């Protein structure tokens, strides 16, 4: 996706205007809504990427058996929720968006982080094991560690 800041701002303003009228962009213009979501994904990737050092440290400690699965789940979840809150504020802040420039290195990082977070529920539901989560964490860690060394 080619990031177009002016278009992103235009879509966000339109979405906010519709929301103030009790309407939503999805119902009014599904294509524009989809385009706005793509811009929001770019922001999500970047926000999570800015916290990559913290995520990598928690992941490395888990992979190196410094912390156990329960400790990993707690530390990762707290970091995830903090980062998600930051994203929720950023995604509607026009001043932040005006300064925003996505990084190609962050591509799909948030997707991996979101998947790890969802895996905790899968373990609770006995859909996967702690070892399977660890394998996925290792895969994500290795994929992105070339961009950041802990």
Regions found by a protein language model. Give the residues of each.
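Acidic, Ser/Pro/Thr-rich low-complexity regulatory regions
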Residues: 1-150
